[in-house]
Amino acid sequence: MLDLKRIRTDFDTVAAKLATRGVDAATLNQMKTIDKERRDLLVKVEELKAERNTVSAEIAQAKRNKENADDKIAAMQKLSAEVKNLDATLAELDAKLTEFTTTLPNIPHESVPVGADEDENVEVRRWGTPRQFDFEAKAHWDLGEDLDILDWERGAKVTGARFLFYKGLGARLERAIYNFMLDEHGKEGYTEVITPYMVNHDSMFGTGQYPKFKEDTFELSDTNFVLIPTAEVPLTNYYRDEILDGKELPIYFTAMSPSFRSEAGSAGRDTRGLIRLHQFHKVEMVKFAKPEESYEELEKMTANAENILQKLNLPYRVVALCTGDMGFSAAKTYDLEVWIPAQNTYREISSCSNTEDFQARRAQIRYRDEADGKVKLLHTLNGSGLAVGRTVAAILENYQNEDGSVTIPEVLRPYMGGLEVIAPK
Protein backbone atom coordinates (compact mmCIF):
# COMPACT_ATOMS: atom_id res chain seq x y z
CA MET A 1 0.00 0.00 0.00
CA LEU A 2 1.31 3.41 -0.92
CA ASP A 3 2.03 6.19 1.54
CA LEU A 4 -0.87 8.64 1.22
CA LYS A 5 1.32 11.45 2.53
CA ARG A 6 3.82 10.81 -0.28
CA ILE A 7 1.06 10.88 -2.88
CA ARG A 8 -0.24 14.14 -1.42
CA THR A 9 3.11 15.95 -1.20
CA ASP A 10 4.73 14.62 -4.38
CA PHE A 11 1.64 14.07 -6.51
CA ASP A 12 3.09 14.79 -9.96
CA THR A 13 6.10 12.50 -9.51
CA VAL A 14 3.98 9.66 -8.14
CA ALA A 15 1.43 10.11 -10.94
CA ALA A 16 4.16 9.98 -13.58
CA LYS A 17 5.68 6.80 -12.11
CA LEU A 18 2.32 5.07 -11.72
CA ALA A 19 1.41 6.01 -15.29
CA THR A 20 4.21 3.66 -16.40
CA ARG A 21 2.31 0.92 -14.56
CA GLY A 22 -0.96 1.63 -16.32
CA VAL A 23 -2.60 3.86 -13.70
CA ASP A 24 -4.40 6.66 -15.49
CA ALA A 25 -4.23 10.27 -14.31
CA ALA A 26 -8.00 10.48 -13.87
CA THR A 27 -7.87 7.81 -11.15
CA LEU A 28 -5.22 9.66 -9.18
CA ASN A 29 -6.93 13.02 -9.66
CA GLN A 30 -10.16 11.54 -8.33
CA MET A 31 -8.26 10.20 -5.35
CA LYS A 32 -6.65 13.62 -4.81
CA THR A 33 -10.08 15.29 -4.85
CA ILE A 34 -11.49 12.81 -2.32
CA ASP A 35 -8.46 13.25 -0.07
CA LYS A 36 -8.84 17.05 -0.09
CA GLU A 37 -12.57 16.79 0.57
CA ARG A 38 -11.85 14.45 3.49
CA ARG A 39 -9.20 16.74 5.01
CA ASP A 40 -11.44 19.81 4.65
CA LEU A 41 -14.27 17.89 6.28
CA LEU A 42 -12.02 16.82 9.15
CA VAL A 43 -11.27 20.46 9.88
CA LYS A 44 -14.98 21.30 9.85
CA VAL A 45 -15.83 18.37 12.15
CA GLU A 46 -13.14 19.41 14.63
CA GLU A 47 -14.49 22.98 14.60
CA LEU A 48 -18.04 21.75 15.24
CA LYS A 49 -16.86 19.47 18.05
CA ALA A 50 -15.02 22.38 19.66
CA GLU A 51 -18.16 24.52 19.36
CA ARG A 52 -20.23 21.68 20.83
CA ASN A 53 -17.86 21.42 23.79
CA THR A 54 -18.17 25.17 24.36
CA VAL A 55 -21.99 25.00 24.30
CA SER A 56 -21.90 21.97 26.60
CA ALA A 57 -19.84 23.94 29.11
CA GLU A 58 -22.29 26.86 28.83
CA ILE A 59 -25.23 24.52 29.51
CA ALA A 60 -23.48 23.16 32.61
CA GLN A 61 -22.81 26.70 33.82
CA ALA A 62 -26.43 27.74 33.17
CA LYS A 63 -27.68 24.76 35.18
CA ARG A 64 -25.37 25.62 38.05
CA ASN A 65 -26.77 29.17 37.95
CA LYS A 66 -30.29 27.73 37.71
CA GLU A 67 -30.81 29.55 34.42
CA ASN A 68 -32.89 28.43 31.45
CA ALA A 69 -30.66 26.50 29.02
CA ASP A 70 -33.28 25.30 26.52
CA ASP A 71 -31.84 27.34 23.64
CA LYS A 72 -28.34 26.10 24.32
CA ILE A 73 -29.54 22.48 24.61
CA ALA A 74 -31.31 22.83 21.25
CA ALA A 75 -28.13 24.33 19.76
CA MET A 76 -26.03 21.46 21.12
CA GLN A 77 -28.47 18.87 19.75
CA LYS A 78 -28.23 20.55 16.35
CA LEU A 79 -24.43 20.53 16.51
CA SER A 80 -24.41 16.86 17.53
CA ALA A 81 -26.65 15.98 14.60
CA GLU A 82 -24.35 17.89 12.23
CA VAL A 83 -21.28 16.10 13.61
CA LYS A 84 -23.01 12.73 13.27
CA ASN A 85 -23.91 13.43 9.63
CA LEU A 86 -20.40 14.65 8.83
CA ASP A 87 -18.86 11.60 10.57
CA ALA A 88 -20.97 9.39 8.31
CA THR A 89 -19.75 11.31 5.26
CA LEU A 90 -16.18 10.98 6.53
CA ALA A 91 -16.60 7.22 6.86
CA GLU A 92 -17.77 7.06 3.23
CA LEU A 93 -14.79 9.13 2.08
CA ASP A 94 -12.42 6.98 4.14
CA ALA A 95 -13.82 3.86 2.47
CA LYS A 96 -13.36 5.38 -1.00
CA LEU A 97 -9.83 6.49 -0.16
CA THR A 98 -8.98 3.03 1.19
CA GLU A 99 -10.30 1.49 -2.02
CA PHE A 100 -7.92 3.68 -4.02
CA THR A 101 -4.84 3.19 -1.83
CA THR A 102 -5.27 -0.59 -1.58
CA THR A 103 -5.70 -1.14 -5.31
CA LEU A 104 -2.88 1.08 -6.59
CA PRO A 105 0.31 -0.85 -7.50
CA ASN A 106 3.69 -0.11 -5.99
CA ILE A 107 5.81 2.76 -7.29
CA PRO A 108 8.63 1.38 -9.46
CA HIS A 109 12.23 1.92 -8.40
CA GLU A 110 14.18 4.40 -10.52
CA SER A 111 16.32 1.56 -11.96
CA VAL A 112 13.32 -0.33 -13.39
CA PRO A 113 13.08 -0.14 -17.20
CA VAL A 114 9.95 1.62 -18.45
CA GLY A 115 7.79 -0.50 -20.72
CA ALA A 116 4.26 -1.67 -21.43
CA ASP A 117 4.62 -5.46 -21.26
CA GLU A 118 7.02 -8.43 -21.25
CA ASP A 119 8.31 -7.53 -24.70
CA GLU A 120 10.06 -4.54 -23.12
CA ASN A 121 11.77 -6.44 -20.30
CA VAL A 122 15.56 -6.10 -20.32
CA GLU A 123 17.93 -9.06 -20.31
CA VAL A 124 20.64 -8.55 -17.68
CA ARG A 125 22.83 -11.64 -18.15
CA ARG A 126 22.93 -15.26 -19.30
CA TRP A 127 24.56 -18.32 -17.80
CA GLY A 128 25.32 -21.59 -19.57
CA THR A 129 24.89 -22.61 -23.19
CA PRO A 130 21.72 -24.36 -24.36
CA ARG A 131 22.46 -27.95 -25.33
CA GLN A 132 22.45 -28.90 -29.00
CA PHE A 133 20.80 -32.30 -29.44
CA ASP A 134 21.85 -34.75 -32.16
CA PHE A 135 18.44 -36.39 -31.88
CA GLU A 136 14.88 -35.07 -31.71
CA ALA A 137 14.39 -33.80 -28.18
CA LYS A 138 11.11 -34.67 -26.47
CA ALA A 139 8.91 -32.39 -24.40
CA HIS A 140 8.93 -33.10 -20.67
CA TRP A 141 5.32 -34.26 -20.67
CA ASP A 142 6.14 -36.97 -23.20
CA LEU A 143 9.28 -37.96 -21.30
CA GLY A 144 7.31 -38.13 -18.06
CA GLU A 145 4.66 -40.37 -19.56
CA ASP A 146 7.16 -42.60 -21.38
CA LEU A 147 9.17 -43.07 -18.18
CA ASP A 148 5.95 -43.68 -16.22
CA ILE A 149 6.81 -41.00 -13.66
CA LEU A 150 4.17 -38.34 -14.48
CA ASP A 151 0.48 -39.14 -14.96
CA TRP A 152 -1.74 -36.35 -16.25
CA GLU A 153 -4.56 -38.61 -17.38
CA ARG A 154 -5.30 -39.87 -13.89
CA GLY A 155 -4.71 -36.40 -12.45
CA ALA A 156 -7.47 -35.11 -14.72
CA LYS A 157 -9.71 -38.05 -13.82
CA VAL A 158 -9.28 -37.66 -10.07
CA THR A 159 -9.35 -33.85 -9.96
CA GLY A 160 -9.42 -32.04 -13.31
CA ALA A 161 -7.32 -30.21 -15.87
CA ARG A 162 -3.91 -28.86 -14.74
CA PHE A 163 -3.47 -31.56 -12.08
CA LEU A 164 -1.22 -34.62 -12.16
CA PHE A 165 0.30 -37.47 -10.20
CA TYR A 166 4.05 -37.75 -9.69
CA LYS A 167 4.88 -41.42 -9.17
CA GLY A 168 7.89 -43.62 -8.49
CA LEU A 169 11.11 -41.91 -9.49
CA GLY A 170 9.14 -38.83 -10.55
CA ALA A 171 7.96 -38.30 -6.98
CA ARG A 172 11.44 -39.04 -5.71
CA LEU A 173 13.00 -36.57 -8.16
CA GLU A 174 10.62 -33.82 -7.06
CA ARG A 175 11.45 -34.52 -3.41
CA ALA A 176 15.18 -34.59 -4.16
CA ILE A 177 14.95 -31.21 -5.88
CA TYR A 178 13.22 -29.35 -3.07
CA ASN A 179 15.39 -30.96 -0.39
CA PHE A 180 18.47 -29.86 -2.34
CA MET A 181 17.07 -26.33 -2.68
CA LEU A 182 16.27 -26.03 1.03
CA ASP A 183 19.73 -27.30 1.97
CA GLU A 184 21.39 -24.77 -0.34
CA HIS A 185 19.36 -21.87 1.05
CA GLY A 186 20.14 -23.04 4.58
CA LYS A 187 23.84 -22.65 3.79
CA GLU A 188 23.12 -19.01 2.86
CA GLY A 189 21.60 -18.22 6.25
CA TYR A 190 17.90 -18.81 5.57
CA THR A 191 15.85 -20.27 8.42
CA GLU A 192 13.72 -23.15 7.14
CA VAL A 193 10.03 -22.89 7.98
CA ILE A 194 7.02 -25.16 7.48
CA THR A 195 4.08 -22.79 7.08
CA PRO A 196 0.32 -23.22 7.24
CA TYR A 197 -1.06 -23.98 3.76
CA MET A 198 -4.13 -21.89 4.50
CA VAL A 199 -4.16 -18.25 5.58
CA ASN A 200 -6.84 -15.75 6.56
CA HIS A 201 -8.02 -12.77 4.55
CA ASP A 202 -5.91 -10.32 6.57
CA SER A 203 -2.79 -12.20 5.50
CA MET A 204 -3.83 -12.08 1.85
CA PHE A 205 -4.34 -8.34 2.21
CA GLY A 206 -0.96 -7.92 3.88
CA THR A 207 1.00 -9.26 0.92
CA GLY A 208 -1.21 -7.59 -1.69
CA GLN A 209 -3.23 -10.46 -3.15
CA TYR A 210 -6.46 -9.09 -1.64
CA PRO A 211 -8.63 -7.35 -2.59
CA LYS A 212 -7.45 -6.87 -6.18
CA PHE A 213 -6.53 -10.45 -7.12
CA LYS A 214 -9.16 -12.43 -5.28
CA GLU A 215 -10.24 -14.25 -8.44
CA ASP A 216 -6.79 -15.84 -8.74
CA THR A 217 -7.13 -17.72 -5.45
CA PHE A 218 -8.97 -20.69 -4.00
CA GLU A 219 -11.13 -19.66 -1.03
CA LEU A 220 -12.75 -22.15 1.31
CA SER A 221 -16.42 -21.22 1.20
CA ASP A 222 -18.09 -20.08 4.42
CA THR A 223 -14.70 -19.66 6.13
CA ASN A 224 -12.03 -16.99 6.50
CA PHE A 225 -9.46 -19.32 4.95
CA VAL A 226 -7.67 -19.23 1.59
CA LEU A 227 -5.30 -21.83 0.12
CA ILE A 228 -1.92 -20.15 -0.22
CA PRO A 229 -0.89 -19.09 -3.76
CA THR A 230 2.72 -19.00 -2.53
CA ALA A 231 4.58 -19.43 0.77
CA GLU A 232 5.40 -15.72 0.45
CA VAL A 233 2.01 -15.04 2.07
CA PRO A 234 2.44 -16.91 5.38
CA LEU A 235 6.18 -16.17 5.58
CA THR A 236 5.74 -12.40 5.15
CA ASN A 237 2.74 -12.27 7.48
CA TYR A 238 4.71 -14.11 10.16
CA TYR A 239 5.62 -10.68 11.56
CA ARG A 240 2.35 -8.90 10.74
CA ASP A 241 1.44 -6.23 13.33
CA GLU A 242 4.81 -6.62 15.06
CA ILE A 243 7.74 -4.33 15.80
CA LEU A 244 11.11 -6.04 15.32
CA ASP A 245 14.43 -5.14 16.87
CA GLY A 246 16.52 -3.41 14.21
CA LYS A 247 19.58 -5.34 15.40
CA GLU A 248 17.95 -8.58 14.18
CA LEU A 249 17.69 -7.41 10.56
CA PRO A 250 18.04 -8.71 7.95
CA ILE A 251 15.98 -11.85 8.62
CA TYR A 252 15.91 -14.66 6.03
CA PHE A 253 13.18 -17.33 5.76
CA THR A 254 12.78 -20.20 3.30
CA ALA A 255 9.95 -22.70 2.93
CA MET A 256 8.77 -25.41 0.60
CA SER A 257 5.02 -25.50 0.17
CA PRO A 258 2.31 -26.37 -2.28
CA SER A 259 0.96 -23.34 -4.13
CA PHE A 260 -2.65 -23.16 -5.26
CA ARG A 261 -3.70 -20.89 -8.12
CA SER A 262 -6.89 -20.64 -10.13
CA GLU A 263 -4.93 -19.40 -13.19
CA ALA A 264 -7.80 -17.08 -14.06
CA GLY A 265 -7.11 -15.56 -17.45
CA SER A 266 -4.74 -18.35 -18.49
CA ALA A 267 -7.19 -20.37 -20.57
CA GLY A 268 -5.43 -21.92 -23.55
CA ARG A 269 -1.92 -21.17 -22.24
CA ASP A 270 0.48 -24.00 -21.35
CA THR A 271 -2.31 -26.55 -21.29
CA ARG A 272 0.21 -29.42 -21.30
CA GLY A 273 3.04 -30.10 -18.94
CA LEU A 274 4.31 -28.71 -15.66
CA ILE A 275 4.60 -25.03 -16.53
CA ARG A 276 1.13 -23.89 -15.43
CA LEU A 277 -0.75 -25.94 -12.83
CA HIS A 278 -3.45 -25.30 -10.24
CA GLN A 279 -1.28 -26.99 -7.59
CA PHE A 280 2.51 -27.12 -7.55
CA HIS A 281 5.43 -27.12 -5.13
CA LYS A 282 7.67 -24.10 -4.78
CA VAL A 283 10.58 -23.24 -2.54
CA GLU A 284 10.21 -19.63 -1.43
CA MET A 285 12.70 -17.14 -0.01
CA VAL A 286 11.52 -14.14 2.05
CA LYS A 287 13.62 -11.38 3.61
CA PHE A 288 12.93 -8.58 6.09
CA ALA A 289 15.50 -5.79 5.72
CA LYS A 290 16.24 -2.18 6.59
CA PRO A 291 15.35 0.21 3.75
CA GLU A 292 18.96 1.21 3.12
CA GLU A 293 19.98 -2.46 2.72
CA SER A 294 17.07 -3.88 0.74
CA TYR A 295 18.45 -3.49 -2.78
CA GLU A 296 21.71 -5.17 -1.81
CA GLU A 297 19.56 -7.95 -0.34
CA LEU A 298 17.63 -8.23 -3.63
CA GLU A 299 20.88 -8.86 -5.51
CA LYS A 300 21.87 -11.50 -2.95
CA MET A 301 18.47 -13.20 -3.17
CA THR A 302 18.67 -13.31 -6.96
CA ALA A 303 22.15 -14.82 -6.66
CA ASN A 304 20.76 -17.45 -4.26
CA ALA A 305 18.20 -18.50 -6.88
CA GLU A 306 20.88 -18.48 -9.58
CA ASN A 307 23.07 -20.71 -7.41
CA ILE A 308 20.46 -23.48 -7.64
CA LEU A 309 20.33 -23.33 -11.43
CA GLN A 310 24.11 -23.22 -11.72
CA LYS A 311 24.59 -26.25 -9.48
CA LEU A 312 21.97 -28.09 -11.54
CA ASN A 313 23.87 -26.93 -14.65
CA LEU A 314 20.70 -25.57 -16.26
CA PRO A 315 21.16 -22.70 -18.77
CA TYR A 316 19.23 -19.58 -17.78
CA ARG A 317 19.00 -15.85 -18.18
CA VAL A 318 18.20 -13.03 -15.77
CA VAL A 319 15.66 -10.44 -16.91
CA ALA A 320 14.79 -7.11 -15.29
CA LEU A 321 11.03 -6.71 -15.57
CA CYS A 322 9.76 -3.45 -17.00
CA THR A 323 7.19 -1.28 -15.24
CA GLY A 324 4.28 -2.75 -17.18
CA ASP A 325 5.16 -6.39 -16.43
CA MET A 326 5.98 -6.25 -12.72
CA GLY A 327 3.75 -7.77 -10.08
CA PHE A 328 1.37 -5.54 -8.13
CA SER A 329 3.45 -5.31 -4.93
CA ALA A 330 6.92 -5.12 -6.49
CA ALA A 331 9.12 -2.03 -6.71
CA LYS A 332 11.73 -4.01 -8.67
CA THR A 333 11.78 -7.59 -9.98
CA TYR A 334 14.28 -9.91 -11.59
CA ASP A 335 12.94 -12.98 -13.36
CA LEU A 336 15.14 -16.03 -13.84
CA GLU A 337 14.21 -17.91 -17.00
CA VAL A 338 15.46 -21.46 -17.59
CA TRP A 339 16.08 -22.97 -21.02
CA ILE A 340 13.32 -25.36 -22.13
CA PRO A 341 14.62 -27.23 -25.23
CA ALA A 342 11.27 -28.51 -26.54
CA GLN A 343 9.95 -24.94 -26.65
CA ASN A 344 13.29 -23.55 -27.85
CA THR A 345 12.99 -20.68 -25.41
CA TYR A 346 13.59 -19.53 -21.85
CA ARG A 347 10.69 -19.83 -19.36
CA GLU A 348 10.29 -18.21 -15.96
CA ILE A 349 11.42 -20.40 -13.07
CA SER A 350 11.97 -17.74 -10.41
CA SER A 351 10.86 -14.20 -9.69
CA CYS A 352 12.79 -12.16 -7.09
CA SER A 353 11.27 -8.88 -5.92
CA ASN A 354 11.84 -6.01 -3.53
CA THR A 355 8.47 -4.63 -2.43
CA GLU A 356 10.15 -1.89 -0.35
CA ASP A 357 7.63 -0.82 2.36
CA PHE A 358 4.54 -1.63 0.23
CA GLN A 359 3.70 -4.91 1.98
CA ALA A 360 5.07 -3.75 5.32
CA ARG A 361 2.63 -0.81 5.34
CA ARG A 362 -0.32 -3.11 4.54
CA ALA A 363 0.76 -5.68 7.13
CA GLN A 364 2.17 -3.14 9.63
CA ILE A 365 5.56 -4.84 9.92
CA ARG A 366 7.95 -2.38 11.55
CA TYR A 367 11.28 -2.26 13.32
CA ARG A 368 12.82 -0.10 16.01
CA ASP A 369 15.94 1.57 14.65
CA GLU A 370 18.77 0.97 17.11
CA ALA A 371 20.41 4.26 16.05
CA ASP A 372 17.59 6.68 16.93
CA GLY A 373 15.01 4.47 18.66
CA LYS A 374 12.32 5.39 16.14
CA VAL A 375 9.80 2.83 14.88
CA LYS A 376 9.90 2.56 11.07
CA LEU A 377 8.49 0.42 8.30
CA LEU A 378 10.96 -2.18 7.07
CA HIS A 379 11.31 -3.55 3.54
CA THR A 380 10.15 -7.03 2.51
CA LEU A 381 11.58 -9.12 -0.32
CA ASN A 382 10.45 -12.40 -1.81
CA GLY A 383 11.70 -14.80 -4.44
CA SER A 384 11.24 -18.31 -5.78
CA GLY A 385 14.13 -20.54 -5.07
CA LEU A 386 12.82 -22.27 -7.26
CA ALA A 387 9.47 -23.39 -8.69
CA VAL A 388 9.93 -27.15 -8.23
CA GLY A 389 7.68 -28.45 -11.02
CA ARG A 390 9.31 -26.19 -13.58
CA THR A 391 12.69 -27.42 -12.36
CA VAL A 392 11.54 -31.00 -12.98
CA ALA A 393 10.49 -29.97 -16.49
CA ALA A 394 13.86 -28.31 -17.15
CA ILE A 395 15.83 -31.33 -15.87
CA LEU A 396 13.81 -33.85 -17.88
CA GLU A 397 14.28 -31.89 -21.10
CA ASN A 398 17.89 -30.74 -20.67
CA TYR A 399 19.17 -34.07 -19.32
CA GLN A 400 17.30 -36.41 -21.69
CA ASN A 401 19.15 -39.07 -23.69
CA GLU A 402 18.49 -40.55 -27.11
CA ASP A 403 17.25 -43.84 -25.62
CA GLY A 404 14.50 -41.97 -23.74
CA SER A 405 16.28 -42.07 -20.38
CA VAL A 406 17.09 -39.01 -18.27
CA THR A 407 20.41 -38.49 -16.52
CA ILE A 408 20.06 -37.25 -12.96
CA PRO A 409 22.08 -34.07 -12.25
CA GLU A 410 25.12 -34.89 -10.15
CA VAL A 411 24.11 -32.70 -7.18
CA LEU A 412 20.80 -34.55 -6.87
CA ARG A 413 22.23 -38.08 -6.82
CA PRO A 414 22.92 -38.11 -3.06
CA TYR A 415 19.23 -37.29 -2.57
CA MET A 416 18.21 -40.22 -4.79
CA GLY A 417 20.29 -42.96 -3.21
CA GLY A 418 23.09 -42.60 -5.75
CA LEU A 419 20.81 -43.23 -8.75
CA GLU A 420 22.34 -41.81 -11.93
CA VAL A 421 19.68 -42.40 -14.60
CA ILE A 422 15.90 -42.67 -14.84
CA ALA A 423 15.42 -45.24 -17.58
CA PRO A 424 12.34 -46.57 -19.39
CA LYS A 425 11.01 -49.77 -17.86
Curated annotation (Swiss-Prot):
Superkingdom of this protein's organism: Bacteria
Keywords per UniProt: Aminoacyl-tRNA synthetase, ATP-binding, Cytoplasm, Ligase, Nucleotide-binding, Protein biosynthesis
Pathway of action: Aminoacyl-tRNA biosynthesis; selenocysteinyl-tRNA(Sec) biosynthesis; L-seryl-tRNA(Sec) from L-serine and tRNA(Sec): step 1/1
Annotated catalysed reactions: tRNA(Ser) + L-serine + ATP = L-seryl-tRNA(Ser) + AMP + diphosphate + H(+); tRNA(Sec) + L-serine + ATP = L-seryl-tRNA(Sec) + AMP + diphosphate + H(+)
Positions annotated to bind L-serine: 230-232, 284, 384
Nucleotide-binding is among the record's keywords: yes
Domain notes: Consists of two distinct domains, a catalytic core and a N-terminal extension that is involved in tRNA binding.
UniProt-recorded name of the protein: Serine--tRNA ligase
Native source organism of the sequence: Streptococcus gordonii (strain Challis / ATCC 35105 / BCRC 15272 / CH1 / DL1 / V288)
Gene (UniProt): serS
